[in-house]
């Protein structure tokens, strides 16, 4: 089967869309727009809280679905399946590890954020540490990361999928999704984003389940996958090398700390630091939890999202591995000329694993469903980024430039920022087309490991250590930025060598895994924060009131009911339900880790 498909050109126009495919895609867009318009009309959009935080009246189900959908952009669909095809199961740890930090978000971080009555994460930092320079730095850093990593990766992967599957013009498909996404984001604010995310989560899960079932029907079952993956070797290889061989530890989650591509030490400690930044301090994610009507709904949303985050192992990673088994000459190619033929990138074609599976296995009609799934993944991620970036710029940058700006002006600026983001995104497409598609997932993780740990250190110390002050936080961020940027520059100047070439990169890149580097950078930044804080005056007591775990007001305005009435009893009951579900969730997560260890 692989030989029969090895000569196909994914960049040529895909199969002709049937009437059923066209109808499914059209219905998806129509329903998506209808949900966006309905939620826009339903929500209050004429106040800052209504537009940016959905009036703080969201229930746990749409919050959980939105948390999941916001993190499952098209870049993750393509990237997880591609990494699964290239290296096996361990990449699923990036998804499963979210369980613990999502629980930390709801039980630790959100109570403090609600108590501090903030809208953005940099706003919390400004309240906690004082001054404006840290808040401005974090706002600008978040905006840049959104444009050049989140938006760029999702746009490239989503457009690549549609281009390969349907043969649509790359620019046309990208611009169409951008415009439709931006329309209801501009119109409805966070409420529209969360409700459309809930719809798109359903579409993503249903479509991915159908593809996974059909993929396993082709291969047999899990044991057959393990045996077949070990033999998924392309017909053309590079002599005297082993890069064409599947990893011996492909079916294991925990890998050697020194030789593993995803060492267990890095996946345990380094990933925790990076995941804490993403799930507990990143505006895109935290904004959803801040929209909850009370703390129980925030907890319920985190629990639902954590359960959903268990799915990508079976819905993305394993299908990627099956794709390599079925199409080893394309997905598993190692010879540069063969890879160039298969996907247009000399370094490898693992990122075509998911779209290749869709095109070869899905029948007419269902192929249109999978196109809708990828559009859902892309648009969910983009709506989240657009709305959160708009919030950051409006609340942290524009209000700083124009402190007397009224609500009408802030809302107008928030909508205009989305238009600017669209322009930057479209202008970035040629750069994405020239980038190395084989490095998308690694690129995203490397950037995160170099820039996120200092931010995590500042948030964690700010919440748990009352002595941390503004001078310590600022210099911790600056030192961390300098060291992280140094490694990033080295990575861009010295990319990983292709198969068959010696690794002559600097020792920092050759011997220190990016997940291990994240740990070192976190420790360094935290040490600088602590040292400078101890050498300078402590923050005043009023400055940390309601802003740290130890000074948190227990009567915080979280929507919690007090007293002995029915409302209070109901609130206490659901608080216990959330806690029991959290314990059950951790047990399920640990079981899966142990099973695939």
From Swiss-Prot:
Residues 1-16, 95-100, 172-174, 223-265, 323-367, 432-444, 494-514 are extracellular. InterPro entries: Na/Glc_symporter_sf (IPR038377), Na/solute_symporter (IPR001734), Na/solute_symporter_CS (IPR018212). The keyword Phosphoprotein applies. Glycans are attached at residue 5. It is found in: Apical cell membrane. Gene3D superfamilies: Sodium/glucose cotransporter. GO terms for molecular function: D-glucose:sodium symporter activity; fructose:sodium symporter activity; mannose:sodium symporter activity. One of its GO terms (cellular component) is apical plasma membrane. The chain crosses the membrane at residues 17-37, 74-94, 101-121, 151-171, 175-195, 202-222, 266-286, 302-322, 368-388, 411-431, 445-465, 473-493, 515-535, 577-597. The keyword Metal-binding does not apply. It is a multi-pass membrane protein. The modification Phosphothreonine is found at residue 149. It catalyses: D-mannose(out) + Na(+)(out) = D-mannose(in) + Na(+)(in); D-fructopyranose(out) + Na(+)(out) = D-fructopyranose(in) + Na(+)(in). Residues 38-73, 122-150, 196-201, 287-301, 389-410, 466-472, 536-576 are cytoplasmic. Pfam families: SSF. The modification Phosphoserine is found at residues 49, 142, 146. Keywords: Cell membrane, Glycoprotein, Ion transport, Membrane, Phosphoprotein, Sodium, Sodium transport, Sugar transport, Transmembrane, Transmembrane helix, Transport. Belongs to the sodium:solute symporter (SSF) (TC 2.A.21) family. This is Sodium/mannose cotransporter SLC5A10. It comes from Sus scrofa (Pig). The gene is SLC5A10.
